UniProtKB/Swiss-Prot annotation:
PANTHER family in the record: PHOSPHOGLYCERATE MUTASE (PTHR11931)
Recorded metabolic or biological pathway in which this protein acts: Carbohydrate degradation; glycolysis; pyruvate from D-glyceraldehyde 3-phosphate: step 3/5
Name of the coding gene: gpmA
GO molecular function per UniProt: phosphoglycerate mutase activity
Annotated family: Belongs to the phosphoglycerate mutase family. BPG-dependent PGAM subfamily.
Active-site residue numbers: H9 (tele-phosphohistidine intermediate), E87 (proton donor/acceptor)
Protein's name in the database: 2,3-bisphosphoglycerate-dependent phosphoglycerate mutase
Origin: domain of life: Bacteria
High-level lineage: Bacteria, Bacillati, Bacillota, Bacilli, Lactobacillales
Free-text function comment from the UniProt entry: Catalyzes the interconversion of 2-phosphoglycerate and 3-phosphoglycerate.
Source species: Lactococcus lactis subsp. cremoris (strain MG1363)
Length: 233
């Protein structure tokens, strides 16, 4: 029974500062590093052995993936990085304190931007200091593929080809898969995996820790879903 382990990146410096992050390439906080290490230890304790790992091109997810593999004694496992697993792009909200954004735009409007399935936040200008246009890690992409803002619907549309081309085939081959990604890219894939409605996915939260495990049958029907937890003494 193949397993898929989702690990949202550990707490980032901007999580700690309560800032909208999106595609901004911020680092893990000290606590986030500890969370990633603990994720690896939980994976080792659970006896889960991976055949392949996937992550985004953002350092907080890459570092979480590397630490989780290192502390589960699986640092040799191949890791594939893809922009399609990046966090949702928060557009012009990127870098703003969430409380300041609410004060400027109103609590209700910010809540809609954050939590609705298909409402886009304000677009990011191409000359914004956090723009992905011109960033070397996206040099191989057509400029039209680089977003200026995303909602969860668009995030799923971006992530879905990677699920269909990479992750799902690996699982169908019986491989155990690790995905180190982000709250909203994981939520998008969970919607696909569990066949959730647009309304149902809005109530799903993905914590920075611990990792989330799915077990599948040969047709990728979910047989079990659980968060890893320390074994009781």
């Amino acid at each position: 029974m193949p397993k898929l382990v989702f690990a949202r990146h550990g707490e980032s410096e901007w999580n700690l500062a309560n800032l909208f992050t999106g595609w901004a390439d911020v680092d893990l906080s000290e606590n986030g590093t500890k969370q990633a290490i603990e994720a690896g230890k939980l994976i080792k304790e659970a006896g889960i052995e991976f055949d392949i790992a996937y992550t985004s091109v953002l350092k907080r997810a890459i570092k979480t993936t590397n630490l989780a593999l290192e502390f589960s004694d699986q640092l040799w496992v191949p890791v594939v990085k893809s922009w399609r697993l990046n966090e949702r792009h928060y557009g012009g909200l990127t870098g703003l304190n969430k409380a300041d954004a609410a004060a400027k735009h109103g609590d209700e409007q910010v809540h809609i931007w954050r939590r609705s399935y298909d409402v886009l936040p304000p677009a990011m200008d191409h000359d914004d200091k956090y723009t992905a246009h011109g960033d070397r890690r996206y040099a191989g992409l057509e400029d039209s593929l680089i977003p200026d803002a995303e909602n969860l619907k668009v995030t799923l549309e971006r992530a879905l080809p990677f699920w269909e081309d990479q992750i799902a085939p690996a699982l169908k081959e019986g491989k155990n898969v690790f995905v180190g990604a982000h709250g909203n890219s994981i939520r998008a894939l969970v919607k696909q995996i569990k066949k959730l409605s647009d309304d149902e996915i809005m109530d799903v939260e993905i914590p920075n820790f611990p990792p989330l495990v799915f077990e599948f049958d040969d047709n990728l029907n979910v047989q079990n879903e659980y968060y890893l937890a320390p074994k009781k003494a």
